[in-house]
């Protein structure tokens, strides 16, 4: 059933999808491809160490295999038919048989599990001849992508032969499934091993690389001499172009400003003249003058005691005045007529035909009419004042309401059930269990105290192991 476990395949697909999703982002940021590979390897190692699933690498499409790179000092030691890795806890890994060993090349194939192996300190490599090799520091044999030496350790620190010091290096190339080869390398490769698992370039290499990078960025002396004047010329040209409006066209700008001022002053005077002319010849002014003439004629007819038949004829005479105002001499004619009417009125008031009673009556009526017109004008003026007062009152009311709203919101902003003493420390207790199911459900059926759950597309952690399922049915009593 282990080969049918879909958890490793699911986890690997998730890891690969995430790595492929961020590959372009890493490339845009200028991060090396090796960093992405190390991230993937670290992720897989974390999943393996969590022990949530077994056979994480065993069920992969290409099983990772391991290569043991042995120094020449171990050639004579491994001249035996079999050798095995013996763990102090008692677990013995499958043994391998050495077929042919020579001075330049050695190969040994043996069956080995297809997933990374963590070898703690104290593990010994034992051969049939009786030679023992003890591991001084913990190592892990993992998968590599083509080149050897992903996890390398200092010389004379990884493996130590009891009685004779020796070194062994581990790496992982892609080889045939379910086989492992042990090959020998020259001692010069052993000397390049660093004291940390990660492979880092040496100091001189970094300095050389930095010098190369610097030489790529800097410009040669000749080119620099050539580029700088061009940059200065471009800068001067651009600055000259920018300074043209200030140097060349400054008189024109000032002249334009003076012209604008003259045009503005001329337009202002023209507007004033037009405004005055419009006031003098506007229909409103003519209507006001027309009303004044009508009032004068009415008063004159009343003072002389004219009948109602003669009044329309006297009213018709000034009614033609607005029509005649369309002529160029309308203002002159209007002023002459008003002056004549005023003179005639004064002469007629002082005439012998008038009596004191008529004069008093005329003055009384004139005062009444003026008072009536004044009341009308006053009423017209009072209406906007009342409207303005009401508008100002509404504005003040809205302003006061706006000012009061934040206070109300501040009072109402108290969170609901703020007085409840709910501690978040109680929440983890709900999930303090080894068995957790995260899934979706189709339906839940209950009969009295018996429940039946129809679940789908979930992950279940049971006893520290992860299981995935497409559909599941569970029963419970509660």
Curated annotation (Swiss-Prot):
Protein localization: Nucleus
Protein name per the record: TFIIA-alpha and beta-like factor
Coiled coil: none
Keyword Nucleus: yes
Organism: Homo sapiens
Bias type Polar residues, positions: 390-401
Protein's gene: GTF2A1L
Region described as Disordered: 309-427
Induction note: Down-regulated in Sertoli cell-only syndrome (SCOS) patients.
């Amino acid at each position: 059933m282990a080969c049918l476990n879909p958890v490793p395949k699911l986890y690997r697909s998730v890891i690969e999808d995430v790595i492929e999703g961020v590959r372009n982002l890493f490339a845009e940021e200028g991060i090396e491809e090796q960093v992405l590979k190390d991230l993937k390897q670290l992720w897989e190692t974390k999943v393996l160490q969590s022990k949530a699933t077994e056979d994480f690498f065993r069920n992969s499409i290409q099983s990772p295999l391991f290569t043991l790179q042995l120094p020449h000092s171990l050639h004579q030691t491994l001249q035996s038919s079999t050798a095995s890795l013996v763990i102090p806890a008692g677990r013995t890994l499958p043994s391998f048989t050495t077929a042919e060993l020579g001075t330049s090349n050695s190969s040994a194939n043996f069956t080995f599990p297809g997933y990374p192996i963590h070898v703690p300190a104290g593990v010994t490599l034992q051969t049939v001849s009786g030679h023992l090799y003890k591991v001084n520091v913990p190592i892990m044999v993992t998968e590599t992508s083509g080149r050897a030496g992903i996890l390398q350790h200092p010389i004379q620190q990884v493996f130590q032969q009891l009685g004779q010091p020796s070194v062994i290096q581990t790496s992982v190339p892609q080889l045939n499934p379910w086989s492992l080869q042990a090959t020998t390398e020259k001692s010069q490769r052993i000397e390049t091993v660093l004291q940390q698992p990660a492979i880092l370039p040496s100091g001189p290499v970094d300095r050389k690389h930095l010098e190369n990078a610097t030489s790529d960025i800097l410009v040669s002396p000749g080119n620099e001499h050539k580029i700088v004047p061009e940059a200065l010329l471009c800068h001067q040209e651009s600055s000259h172009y920018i300074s043209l409006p200030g140097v060349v066209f400054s008189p024109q700008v000032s002249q334009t400003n003076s012209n604008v001022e003259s045009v503005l002053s001329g337009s202002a005077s023209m507007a004033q003249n037009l405004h005055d002319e419009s006031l003098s010849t506007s229909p409103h002014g003519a209507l006001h003058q027309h009303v004044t003439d009508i009032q004068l004629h009415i008063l004159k007819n009343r003072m002389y005691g004219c009948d109602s038949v003669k009044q329309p004829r006297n009213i018709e005479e000034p009614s033609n005045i607005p029509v005649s105002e369309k002529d160029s001499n309308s203002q002159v004619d209007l002023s002459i007529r008003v002056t004549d009417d005023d003179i005639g009125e004064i002469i007629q008031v002082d005439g012998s035909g008038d009596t004191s009673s008529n004069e008093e009556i005329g003055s009384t009526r004139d005062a009444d009419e003026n008072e009536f017109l004044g009341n009308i004008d006053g009423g017209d003026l009072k209406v906007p004042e009342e409207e303005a007062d009401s508008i100002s009152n509404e504005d003040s009311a809205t302003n006061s309401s706006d000012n009061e709203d934040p206070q109300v919101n501040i009072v109402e902003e108290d969170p609901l059930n703020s007085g409840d003493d709910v501690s978040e420390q109680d929440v983890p207790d709900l999930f303090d269990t080894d068995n957790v199911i995260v899934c979706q459900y189709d339906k839940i059926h209950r009969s009295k105290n018996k429940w039946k759950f129809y679940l789908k597309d979930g992950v279940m952690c049971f006893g520290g192991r992860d299981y995935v399922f497409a559909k599941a049915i569970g029963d419970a009593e509660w």
